Design a protein with these regions (language model features):
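A domain-level signal for the structural core that forms small-molecule/cofactor-binding pockets
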Residues: 2-62
């Protein structure tokens, strides 16, 4: 039972997440042979003030 965890900055729409989940599921199925119905995709929406890159919070960028 493959589990794919996706962490993203908050702000994606439900449609965007649905499209990502479908593509990820297809890719995992294609390369692992796991049945689509057992492939799980989870999304973690991270607020800009809770994610940093290079020591700088995303809330401090643009």
């Amino acid at each position: 039972m493959p589990i794919v965890q996706v962490s993203l900055l908050a702000g994606r729409t439900e449609e965007q997440k649905k499209a990502m989940a479908e593509e990820i599921t297809e890719t995992v199925n294609k390369h692992s042979g796991a049945p689509k119905e057992v492939i799980t995709v989870t999304f973690s929406d991270i607020e800009r003030d809770s994610w940093a890159a290079g020591g700088i919070l995303y809330s401090e960028k643009n």
